[in-house]
């Protein structure tokens, strides 16, 4: 009934690299407004025609359920043994209002963004991971000036 045609190959192409990168960018503030999670950055990078530029920017995750936001804050930069805690956005906003989250790695897939990096407080970094779940778009609001 079924004919063996050999192995099936599927190639997953990720297309072109995005114009903007959050790598090494620092989050100044995180807000939740009208079901959108908004990250305000001091700058993000853009790459076009071999030229790197920086821009003041906000990243908006639309239709984000705040109950599904996971923020993991560790006690070190995860080189060996570590401990940490899972906190919610209000606690992050209270405890780390004077801190900056430096994005080192950004990963996106099917309504999920994972930002990993260092949370800087008074010049001292600890590892931090933010798991963001959203059903809308991820929008770059960039000041091109």
What are the language-model segments listed below?
Residues 2-145:
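Surface-exposed, interaction-prone regions used to assemble/regulate multi-protein complexes
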């Amino acid at each position: 009934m079924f004919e063996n045609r050999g192995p099936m190959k599927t190639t997953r192409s990720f297309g072109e690299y995005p114009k903007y990168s959050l790598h090494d960018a620092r989050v100044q503030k995180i807000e939740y407004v009208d079901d959108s999670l908004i990250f305000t950055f001091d700058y993000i990078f853009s790459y076009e025609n071999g030229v790197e530029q920086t821009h003041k920017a906000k990243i908006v995750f639309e239709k984000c359920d705040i109950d599904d936001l996971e923020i993991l804050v560790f006690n070190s930069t995860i080189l060996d043994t570590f401990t940490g805690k899972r906190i919610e956005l209000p606690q992050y906003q209270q405890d780390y209002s004077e801190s900056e989250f430096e994005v080192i790695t950004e990963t996106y897939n099917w309504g999920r963004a994972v930002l990993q990096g260092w949370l800087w407080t008074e010049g001292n970094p600890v590892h931090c991971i933010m798991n963001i779940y959203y059903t809308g778009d991820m929008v770059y609001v960039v000041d091109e000036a």
